[in-house]
């Protein structure tokens, strides 16, 4: 080895030659109280870093950081922020721990299944650092509470996995005048950036500069639909925690105005420069974000458009003539399926390529994992004239829970 790589390997100090120190932002938080004897011992590896030191650690101690979600991204971010000595950590989370979470949400354990995620996350944080004040907000983040909640904190971390909440977080952060760290994961790839409309150096950007409009519903699958490599949120969540620490202490160059893209399969990181959209409409109020993102398909809004698992069971038991269509992906079909179903992935319905092959005069029942993708496919069928089409409310998960408990749930 030679160069910087060799010097790092042998422990020789390496001086950074990047312009990062010239682009640092002022520290977000003023120093808190003096450190106690135990705190000096705990954070000693921070204290001997010149750029952090005692003052930086006191800033962390005085910081109030709010994490939206205690799931895949929130788990590592919360654990490392607690270990780093962030004084007050808020958690917005209203879900319970499920078995499928354990593959990636490392803040929760097997014994936590069925518990509120907020409670589980709090216990894990305090087990690492009982000097942290943990505030739980066990509620859904909504337009009615977001700004008021954000105003109580110095910095926000967005660990959510849907576009409606991401736009809500962004707009609320803009109105509250708060910076926030955003992360996103899917299968083998992740992204991280920092958004701060009121950044003091004039580089202010927000999420709408990256995504002016939400993609059409269903175009970008969630982790529940498309899957995610279990270790991926560990990488991205840790980067998010790093950005939070940099903002609080004022060290380094934050990802403000840059998008970090990580490819786990290629083991590569790259950054893309972001610029303010000159045509972006200023954020002046919070709106209905589910409507903004088009989350609820018109065809699925009517109660007549869905059947319950028990209703479908009765239809099948009575031998009714119907076409049961599974709109999930082939890999999901291999995990679990409803007997008698035919696999027709949603994208083939949305593209219209299979419409001619579907029966016009036979009732059609669509299903997916939870009912979201089947509702999207149903909207296309209704527009195409399939008047006797419906979908399974709750999808194959509800079927397994209510009709056939022997089936696996994923």
Describe these PLM feature segments.
Residues 2-3, 11-27, 130-143, 147-148, ...:
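E1/E1-like adenylate-forming module used to activate ubiquitin-like modifiers
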Residues 3-11, 16-19, 25-27, 123, ...:
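Rhodanese-like catalytic fold shared by cysteine-dependent sulfurtransferases
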Residues 67-70, 91, 366:
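Hydrophobic Val/Ile/Leu positions in short beta-strands of Rossmann-like dinucleotide-binding domains
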Residues 238-253:
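Oxidoreductase and adenylate-handling cofactor-binding alpha/beta cores
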Residues 73-74, 373:
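Hydrophobic/small residue at the entry helix of a nucleotide-binding pocket
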Residues 60, 149-154, 358-359:
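A short, aliphatic-rich alpha-helical micro-motif
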Residues 25-34, 91-129:
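Glycine-rich phosphate-binding loop and adjoining beta1-alpha1-beta2 segment
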Residues 2-66, 99-100, 288-300:
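N-terminal charged helix/coil linker that caps or initiates catalytic domains
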């Amino acid at each position: 080895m030679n160069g910087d790589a060799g010097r790092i390997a042998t422990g020789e100090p390496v001086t950074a030659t990047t312009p990062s120190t010239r682009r640092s932002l002022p520290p977000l938080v003023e120093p808190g109280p003096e450190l106690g004897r135990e705190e000096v011992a705990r954070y000693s590896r921070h204290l001997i870093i010149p750029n952090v030191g005692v003052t930086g650690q006191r800033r962390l101690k005085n910081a109030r950081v709010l994490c939206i979600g205690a799931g895949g991204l929130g788990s590592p971010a919360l654990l490392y922020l607690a270990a780093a000595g962030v004084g007050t950590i808020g958690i917005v989370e209203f879900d319970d721990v499920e078995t499928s979470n354990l593959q990636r949400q490392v803040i929760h354990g097997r014994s936590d299944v069925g518990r509120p995620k907020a409670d589980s996350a709090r216990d894990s944080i305090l087990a690492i650092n009982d000097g942290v004040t943990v505030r739980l907000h066990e509620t859904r983040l909504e337009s009615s509470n977001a700004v008021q909640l954000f105003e109580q904190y110095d910095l926000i971390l967005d660990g959510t996995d849907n576009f409606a909440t991401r736009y809500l977080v962004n707009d609320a952060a803009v109105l509250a005048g708060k910076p926030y760290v955003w992360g996103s994961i899917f299968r083998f790839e992740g992204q991280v950036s920092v958004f701060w409309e009121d950044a003091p150096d004039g580089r202010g950007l927000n999420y709408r500069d990256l995504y002016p409009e939400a993609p059409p519903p269903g175009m970008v699958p969630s982790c529940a639909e498309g899957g995610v490599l279990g270790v991926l949120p560990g990488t991205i969540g840790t980067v998010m925690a790093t950005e939070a620490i940099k903002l609080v202490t004022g060290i380094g160059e934050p990802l403000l105005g840059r998008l970090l893209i990580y490819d786990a399969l290629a083991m590569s990181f790259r950054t893309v420069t972001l610029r303010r959209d000159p045509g972006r409409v200023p954020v002046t109020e919070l709106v209905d974000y589910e409507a903004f993102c088009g989350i609820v398909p018109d065809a699925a809004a009517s109660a007549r458009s869905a059947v319950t698992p028990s209703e479908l069971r009765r239809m099948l038991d009575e031998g009714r003539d119907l076409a049961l269509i599974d709109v999930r992906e082939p890999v999901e079909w291999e995990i679990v399926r409803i007997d008698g179903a035919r696999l027709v992935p949603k994208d083939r319905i949305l593209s219209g390529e299979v419409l001619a092959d579907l029966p016009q005069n036979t009732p059609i029942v669509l299903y997916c994992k939870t009912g979201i993708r089947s509702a999207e496919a149903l909207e296309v069928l209704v527009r195409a004239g399939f008047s006797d089409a419906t979908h399974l409310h709750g999808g194959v998960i509800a079927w397994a829970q209510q009709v056939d408990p022997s089936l696996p749930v994923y």
